Amino acid sequence: GLIPIGWLGASALCAVVANERARLVGVIAYAAVPLPYAAVAGGRHQVLIAYAVIPWALHLIRSFGGIGTSIVDDEPGDVVNHPSTEQRIRLVAKMSLLFGITLAFSPSVIFVVLLSALLWLLTAAISGGSTRAAGLGFAGALAATASAVVLNMPWMTRYLSSDGWSAIVGAPTHTPENLGLWNVLRFGIGPAALGGLIVLLYVPLLVAPLVSKNSRFIWASRAVILSVVSIALALLNSADQLPFRLPETGILLAPVASCLAIGAAIIVMAFGIDVRGGRFGWRQPLALLSLITLPLGILPVVAAAPNGQWQQPSSTLAQQMKELLGDTSQGDYRILVVGDPRLVTSDQHAYKSGLTYALFENGDATMLNQVSSGSDEAANLVQPLLDAVALSSTKRVGRLMAPLGIRYIVIPLLDRVHSTSDSPLPLPLGFREAFAEQLDLRNVYGPSSMVIFENSQWIPLAGMLSTVAAQQSSEGGSNALVATELTGSIAVLNGTTSWDSPSQEIPAGRLHVGFPFDSRWTLSINGESVKPQASFGTVMHYETGNGGVAELQYRNPLSRYIWVLLQTLLCVLVGLGVLQPK
């Protein structure tokens, strides 16, 4: 549904021209851009979010600033039509709601929106537009961003950590993407780039400032400057030639798609107002040439649309992991996926040498089963384990991973999008071999798209410890773990999560729970509560006494309910702003 939302946003944005035919042409040009289809093929959901959000955001920013619609008999400069106070309240509320939802899923898109609004302000100063209106639009975008941050508290605090910027723009890669100018111009971020005819849509974009007048010239200038800067940033960021990292190429190119739509709409309107009927010169053939390129530029998407597959791979890495590693009959477990950021599923945590890692429960690589990369678990517990492998400080890393329930380690190699058999993404030298040298990791037969190691020492996320493991669990520290045979634990309470608490008859002994110690996890046996105790130095266990019917529950702190109540009130407040009478 994100792609049609983007089309509707382009329709709203192209309303800057007071000509329905020109507006329709702009929407068609936006739909012809292969960016979202390449994102679908490559599984880049953040690019899809950018494609859907950015035209709506630019439309609301324009409306808040008071930049009006280009009309036939306008004067030089922007058409300014400042909204009333009530209208501005409604517009900033809409922006806050849009930015709040976007920030929850893709904060890097908000960064690109603010950059676009700033470039519009600079364009107004250069081309003779209304700097006051553009400045008001930028101020409205900043206010909406602040509101969006508040709406997403306290979860936004994860971006204040040491790797907060990586969480926003993505982790650095081992090798740069280095797409090159041609691929950037044709939005070639994935297999469904649809050839090179799309570059013909740049002709109307570049010609529009040359043949248009008055407010149409200002809008054409905005589109050209924003697209040129966006393309330059995407090109430099792709080649890793900037002193800082920016969002991925597809997100940086999303404003260019909006600019192509504006350029197409402006050239159609300008041809009928500023070109046709005037003294014959170079402007007429140039404008006519740009009109001819429009249908040619949309041909690829028209040809590819009936199939609807957009060259997607037949199966994804996540689907393969679910099929191969989804058996939970022996208890709940975790999968540690570590590799190139372009192959590791989202919510990754940055490691060294351009690698990232992510944790999933029970082989299901979905958002609900991900262990947040912003948690202390990912930052404090997993990284030292990877360090131990990289430094060869132990040959028993499987035993160190066992308390966390890590059963499989997956190194993705090929996704048939970013990494193919003909052009695989390289891994750091000796990376695979370091895992293969571990004595308690067994190389499992799997597809060529990934390397799978199974931890022979893994302990179920919830399980009754074996006698030997129970004796050593109170010792803590890596030395006790490495020296202990941890097999033989019995899985219990399968399916336990912070929101689901199944009950089961369990025997006497020591119940291991593979979560970092948290007193809010409570075990009840026959209705009596049991307090958790530290286990293996990182996780926790419960003494079950004589056993009985057990249930493991997570009790949310009072602050969680206060935050939910506060967020609900804020959302109601924003909703009232959206419903402000016109």
Predicted regions and their residues:
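Transmembrane alpha-helix segments characteristic
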Residues: 214-241
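Signature aromatic-anchored transmembrane alpha helix within multi-pass, membrane-resident enzymes
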Residues: 271-300
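Active-site-proximal, structured, solvent-exposed surfaces of multi-pass membrane proteins
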Residues: 475-582
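Extracytoplasmic/lumenal acceptor-recognition loop(s) of multi-pass membrane glycoenzymes
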Residues: 295, 326-408, 412-418, 472-485, ...
